[in-house]
């Protein structure tokens, strides 16, 4: 069974009527812990990466090209019901490309479809929705833009071994709260970086605060240890003072404000490439 990764809002804002209005949702991390199986996969990839680096055989990675299918699932054709515009979608793709380009990852919008379904729009009947809407192969990214995810801003699934048309194959992809797209109404989280963050999980990354101050953390050697998720943009935060480095508050895999996000690390780039090559690059179904 795959693992769903959540960004949780601590308080729900009242639903807007008519045109969308600015809302504020402070949020906490509610991510399910990676399974033992997935952690073992990550450990094995980390060991391979370290061995290759020690032998000096790390090679330049060709650009990873990801086809993206947007599925806008709304309760009506009103923006406040999740019916985002094509401009918001195009701006979201541009945001992703700006964030991932330094790591040789490129996203191409391959298609957008709109569905009016009040149940699916609030994350009801997830598997049925995805069986009806999913497109492409396991190397193609499906983004489901929904009106409401309960307390969540978004969730995604880690890469793993799947067979075509299995439930795990259908579940793959990310569900994103509509007003986190660029131009959305969610204060502090409306520049499109909820998607940037969630797609990091789609590439196999954990949160920077995975594991806290002890152990292997997120299994990436160049992300400083972090006791818990950040809130806002707390410059100088050092939640693991006995460990090297300040908290990586600007890292896309923390939970900072969108305006605070700036980077993935070199180690995260290597990990995304490893997971891509292992599970997605050669997918034909």
UniProtKB/Swiss-Prot annotation:
Source domain of life: Eukaryota
GO CC term, one of those recorded: extracellular region
Residues binding Zn(2+), per UniProt: 197, 201
Protease recorded as keyword: yes
Disulfide bond positions: 233-260
Active site positions: 198
Family membership: Belongs to the peptidase M43B family.
Protein name per Swiss-Prot or TrEMBL: Extracellular metalloprotease NCU07200
Gene source species: Neurospora crassa (strain ATCC 24698 / 74-OR23-1A / CBS 708.71 / DSM 1257 / FGSC 987)
Upper lineage: Eukaryota, Fungi, Dikarya, Ascomycota, Pezizomycotina
């Amino acid at each position: 069974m795959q693992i769903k990764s959540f960004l949780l809002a601590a308080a729900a804002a009242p639903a807007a009527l008519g045109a969308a209005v600015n809302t504020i949702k402070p949020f906490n991390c509610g991510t399910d812990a990676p399974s033992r199986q997935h952690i073992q996969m990550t450990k094995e990839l980390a060991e391979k990466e370290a061995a290759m680096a020690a032998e000096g055989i790390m090679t330049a990675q060709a650009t990873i090209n990801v086809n993206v299918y947007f599925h806008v699932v709304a309760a009506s054709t009103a923006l406040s019901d999740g019916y985002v515009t094509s401009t918001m979608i195009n701006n979201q793709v541009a945001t992703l490309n700006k964030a991932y380009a330094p790591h040789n990852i490129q996203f191409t919008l391959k298609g957008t479809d709109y569905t009016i379904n009040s149940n699916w729009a609030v994350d009801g009947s997830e598997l049925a929705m995805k069986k009806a809407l999913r497109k492409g192969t396991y190397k193609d990214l499906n983004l489901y833009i929904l009106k409401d995810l309960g307390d969540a801003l978004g969730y995604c699934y880690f890469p793993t071994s799947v067979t075509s048309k299995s439930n795990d194959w259908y579940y793959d992809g990310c569900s994103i709260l509509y007003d986190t797209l660029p131009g959305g109404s969610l204060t502090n989280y409306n520049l499109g970086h909820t998607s940037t963050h969630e797609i990091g999980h789609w590439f196999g990354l954990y949160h920077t605060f995975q594991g806290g101050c002890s152990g292997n953390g997120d299994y990436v050697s160049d992300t400083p240890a972090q006791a818990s998720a950040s809130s806002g943009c707390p410059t100088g935060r050092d939640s693991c003072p006995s460990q090297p480095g300040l908290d990586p508050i600007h890292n896309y895999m923390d939970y900072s404000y969108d305006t605070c996000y700036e980077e993935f690390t070199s180690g995260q780039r290597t990990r995304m490439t490893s997971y891509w090559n292992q599970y997605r690059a050669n997918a034909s179904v």
